[in-house]
Regions:
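Conserved Rossmann-fold NAD(P)-dependent oxidoreductase catalytic core, especially the SDR/UDP-sugar
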Residues: 90-137
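Substrate-positioning beta->alpha
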Residues: 140, 144, 169-175, 189-211, ...
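Flexible, glycine-rich beta-alpha linker
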Residues: 115, 157-175
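Active-site Tyr-X1-5-Lys
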Residues: 133-159
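Mid/C-terminal beta-alpha module of Rossmann-like enzyme folds, strongest
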Residues: 209-275, 294, 314-317, 325
């Protein structure tokens, strides 16, 4: 089976490629990063440099494909609405048109950030997603993209993977470790809020399961490691493996929130493109619990995480040490 993978040059992309190749799929890696594309070609992966905003690129790249895994997205907490709309909404429209005309199955990588809000949320199920959430443009665009897919005539599946981490991550863990070195990590509620994180290999595995499952077409699935853990405990796992101590800053949410909210308004008013030091979305992530229920993925996809959080942490730290020694 031949599969078109958008976002192939991103963090998740290489893991999906490995998962599919090791299960005898032929992958067309579609992305914009030529440098990473060249490394994929060196590893005998067919790479197509293209843009999901360009329908012709998609039609040419998908020749002979039976399915599409759509992982490409602009996924940041700040930016211009038109950029999120063009990539995450119009880009998805192009994917839908491609799949409808060529009769391809679609597996869409969405985001559980659509659940985000100013409250604790435990054991959240897929049908608890709001119809609208304007906390940031990324969330708004992902909800719009999901609606487009759900209203289409496609054979589709949607997954919402939570807090991806692993080797190659340039977002969650590196930022926290860097923050710890510089000033310390802000803590609310003594870091006892519960969160889910997910080994990126498990997400790639879940995508393959969704690709292969034709019994529950139209299904939407939360994906996590199924190991809810306190925020401070995650940090402690990493620090213990690294052999360092965590530096923590106790912040008062009631004092910080008005400042962050005001700062966002100022940035929006003056159309400042640079991301503010802190956003309401990031603040909610740090302050409130959010864990996801994955019973549906277990029952319908047969998804059970292959790699535990502690295994993922050990692999990440070991790889980082090797890189440090070689640099």
């Amino acid at each position: 089976m031949k599969v078109l993978l958008t976002g192939a040059t991103g963090f998740l992309g290489k893991y999906v490629i490995n998962e599919l190749k090791s299960n005898n799929y032929k992958v067309i890696a579609f992305g914009r990063n030529e440098k990473i594309g060249k490394t994929l070609v060196d590893e005998n992966v067919e790479f197509y440099k293209g843009d999901i905003e360009n329908l012709d690129d998609l039609f040419r790249a998908s020749e002979g494909c039976s399915a599409v895994i759509h992982a490409a997205a602009l996924s940041t907490v700040w930016g211009k609405w038109e950029n999120f709309y063009n990539i995450n909404v119009l880009g998805t429209k192009n994917i839908i048109r491609l799949c409808e005309e060529k009769k391809l199955k679609l597996v869409f990588v969405s985001s559980p950030s659509i659940y985000a809000g100013a409250k604790d949320q435990l054991d959240v199920r897929e049908d608890e997603a709001p119809e609208e959430n304007n906390l940031n443009f990324y969330i708004k665009s992902k909800i719009m993209a999901e609606k487009l897919i759900r209203s289409s005539s496609l054979n589709y599946m949607i997954i919402r993977p939570r807090g991806l981490f692993g080797i190659g991550d340039t977002s969650i863990i590196p930022r926290l470790l860097d923050l710890n070195k510089k000033i310390g990590i802000p803590l609310f509620a003594d870091g006892k809020q519960k969160v889910d994180i997910t080994c990126v290999e498990n997400v790639a595995y879940a995508l393959r399961l969704a690709l292969e499952n034709n019994e529950y077409l139209g299904g939407i699935y939360n994906i996590t490691n199924d190991e809810p853990i306190e925020f401070k405990e995650i940090l402690t796992l990493f620090f213990n493996e690294i052999g360092t101590k965590g530096k923590y800053l106790k912040w008062n949410y009631n004092l910080i929130f008005p400042l962050v909210s005001f700062m966002e308004r100022v940035y929006k008013f003056f159309r400042i493109e640079k991301e503010p030091p802190l956003t309401k979305y990031t603040l909610y992530l740090m302050r409130y619990s959010q864990t996801l229920n994955i019973d549906k993925a277990k029952k319908e996809l047969g998804y059970y995480p292959k790699i535990s959080v502690i295994e993922g942490v050990k692999k990440y730290v070991e790889h980082s040490r090797k890189n440090d020694r070689n640099s």
